[in-house]
């Protein structure tokens, strides 16, 4: 954002704010004029405030502003400064005047014609740039600029040149469905096809979180598609990919030089070109991703995408800010709100910001046949936006899977309710990651020494009961995700005096809890083979050496992989309901549900479980079994077993 000695901002339809540097004639003047071409209007000073580094004036504006024009403010010594359309863009009047309902923003290729449309209501001019040639676009209804060519321009690269607030900005298309490497230009793509299909609802969801980069040595969509057998054999039924839309932090031409998970979004409707196995064929990325999605579906799994709608990596240099400055992001004290520590917060309650993200999800759902979305730091997004997302996507896929991080965050947004745990009941179509579950069973994530119920603090058994006996369809059960240190690292830190084998046993117990607590099961890549990242708290940019799954010898922990696979298979076979009865017997948990008995023994000693009838052993603590026992069953230390009542 350009700063001048005198900065003039249109903050509402009747208010102009002047911020005058004290170096400009000591920061004080007695008159201001609104200038447009050869016309001048005297402005009245409403109030004045002197601050340490500047003087602030509020002026009354008694004339109508034409947003197709660029105005200036003139003051002492005939000094001219551009009138910046600032917080006027956040007013209800602006929303009503410029909200565009149609679904044709971006590029539409149809009947041999190519139409470009860009929403830029505060821009005085917009040009389309193709092959260094500039084509002036026409301003139409609701501030939408458009131009049409009687030719199919598929695979052509383009940019927009936007004249706004006295600046001329070269930018990519926020609705671009493909970008050149490193987001230097957008690519024309025909995305008119609706490839979505409705799939049968999974009875028990088991989500597996993984990064495309980490899954294979090649770190491409194609390599992941060719190596899906591992996930199929593991038995999970939902593949959740870490961000695949275009992001910063990785050079697409030299992808192995720097590492990044992708929570640094740049372009939301296009895919990250570093995952393209044919980097010089830009559109190949879309087909390769479609092939991956199709292969996941062929293997009877669903696919969900991790989307980062809460913040932008570099707001001031984003296409959003270059096209409609001040509109898309939240501001606090005149600057971007960055309360999450990741980047500027999106102002999702604004109609065109909300529409953008809904349009983005509709595109991925229809064109790529995506089955659901995980919302990063969902607590920064507003409830109304999330509910509109749900209602829109359910019309396409009634069983769409929607979930996210509902942490209660400090945000600049104070006017509307935010999509956090406290407002869960207002969002019935969403599931929330349950940090209470995580901390109960594993121990407090942020206190390395803290023990959970399954890592040595048996007194937490009463707390643990609730996770097996309540309706928890809105909860995601997890003990490890991409954030924070791995579960196995946490176990080793919180149980430093135990043997390696004991650590493995506790890892197994935690996997069992994730799979059989009521709610949605969530496993993070590597959890099933005790992945350790050297106690690193956050590996988002660590290296391929640390993060890539192929660097780990899975055979060392084959017993844990087999254990996980067996339990997933059992979870799919047996029918459990929400009417569990869970009891704590001196630190042991006994869960009774629909003729099944699930028992957790997190203690260091064996336990004899006595009963008066005959029971079938479904899982003996290590593997799937099928044999009968009478009167009693010995439960090994640090183990989980499943029995079935015989009638």
Predicted regions and their residues:
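Conserved, mostly hydrophobic/aromatic
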Residues: 118, 210, 241, 296, ...
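Conserved alpha/beta catalytic core and glycan-binding cleft of carbohydrate-active enzymes
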Residues: 176-182, 390-538, 575, 584-585, ...
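Substrate-binding/active-site clefts of carbohydrate-active enzymes
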Residues: 211-222, 226-368, 378-381, 386-397
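The feature marks proteins involved in alpha-glucan
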Residues: 2-7, 52-115, 134-209, 216
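Short, surface-exposed alpha-helix to beta-strand junction/turn motifs within ectodomains of secreted
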Residues: 23-43, 124-132
């Amino acid at each position: 954002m350009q700063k001048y000695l005198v900065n003039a901002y249109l903050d509402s339809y009747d208010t102009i704010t002047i911020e005058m540097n004290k170096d400009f004639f000591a920061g004080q003047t007695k008159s201001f004029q609104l200038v447009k071409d050869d016309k001048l209007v005297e402005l009245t000073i409403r109030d004045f405030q002197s601050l340490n580094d500047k003087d602030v004036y509020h002026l009354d504006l008694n004339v109508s502003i034409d947003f197709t024009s660029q105005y200036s403010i003139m003051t002492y010594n005939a000094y001219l400064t551009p009138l910046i359309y600032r917080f006027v863009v956040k007013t209800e009047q602006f929303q009503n005047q410029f909200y565009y309902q149609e679904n044709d923003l971006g590029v539409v290729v149809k009947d041999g014609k190519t139409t470009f449309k860009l929403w830029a209501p505060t821009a005085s001019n917009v040009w389309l740039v193709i092959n260094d040639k500039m084509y002036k676009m026409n301003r139409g209804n609701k501030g939408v600029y458009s131009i049409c060519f009687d030719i199919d321009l598929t695979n052509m690269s383009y940019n927009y040149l936007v004249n706004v607030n006295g600046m001329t900005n070269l930018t990519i298309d926020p609705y671009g469905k493909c970008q050149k490497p490193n987001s230097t230009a957008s690519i024309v793509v025909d995305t008119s096809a609706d490839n979505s299909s409705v799939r049968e609802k999974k009875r028990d969801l088991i989500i597996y979180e993984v990064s495309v980069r980490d899954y294979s040595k090649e770190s491409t969509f194609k390599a992941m598609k060719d190596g899906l057998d591992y996930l199929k054999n593991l038995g999970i039924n939902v593949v959740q990919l870490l961000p695949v839309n275009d992001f910063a932090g990785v050079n697409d031409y030299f992808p192995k030089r720097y590492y990044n998970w992708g929570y640094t979004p740049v372009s939301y409707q296009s895919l990250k070109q570093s995952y393209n196995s044919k980097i010089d064929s830009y559109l190949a990325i879309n087909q390769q991703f479609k092939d991956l999605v199709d292969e996941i579906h062929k293997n009877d799994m669903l696919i969900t995408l991790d989307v980062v709608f809460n913040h932008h990596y570099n707001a001031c240099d984003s296409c959003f800010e270059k096209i409609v400055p001040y509109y898309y992001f939240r501001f606090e004290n005149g600057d971007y709100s960055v309360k999450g520590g990741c980047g500027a917060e999106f102002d999702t309650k604004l109609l065109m910001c909300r529409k953008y993200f809904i349009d983005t999800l509709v595109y991925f759902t229809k064109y790529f046949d995506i089955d659901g979305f995980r919302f990063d730091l969902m607590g920064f997004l507003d409830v109304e936006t999330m509910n509109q997302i749900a209602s829109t996507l359910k019309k396409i896929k009634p069983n769409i899977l929607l979930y996210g991080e509902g942490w209660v965050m400090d945000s600049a947004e104070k006017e509307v309710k935010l999509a956090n745990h406290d407002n869960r009941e207002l969002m019935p179509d969403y599931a929330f990651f349950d940090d209470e579950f995580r901390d109960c069973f594993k121990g407090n994530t942020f206190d390395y020494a803290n023990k959970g119920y399954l890592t040595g603090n048996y007194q937490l058994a009463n707390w643990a009961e609730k996770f097996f006996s309540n309706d928890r369809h809105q909860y995601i059960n997890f003990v490890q995700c991409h954030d924070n240190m791995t579960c196995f690292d946490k176990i080793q830190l919180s149980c430093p005096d135990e043997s390696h084998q004991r650590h493995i046993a506790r890892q197994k117990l935690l996997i069992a809890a994730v799979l059989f607590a009521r709610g949605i099961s969530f496993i993070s890549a590597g959890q099933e083979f005790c992945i350790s990242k050297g106690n690193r708290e956050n590996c988002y940019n660590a290296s391929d050496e640390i993060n890539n799954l192929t660097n780990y010898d899975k055979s060392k922990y084959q017993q844990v992989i087999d254990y996980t696979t067996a339990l997933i298979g059992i979870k799919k076979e047996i029918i459990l309901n929400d009417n569990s009865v869970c009891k704590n017997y001196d630190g042991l948990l006994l869960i009774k549900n629909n003729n099944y008995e699930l028992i957790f023994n997190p203690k260091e000693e064996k336990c004899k479980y006595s009963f008066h009838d005959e029971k079938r052993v479904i899982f003996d603590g290590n593997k799937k079994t099928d044999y009968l026992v009478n009167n009693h069953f010995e439960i090994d230390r640090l183990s989980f077993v499943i029995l079935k009542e015989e009638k």
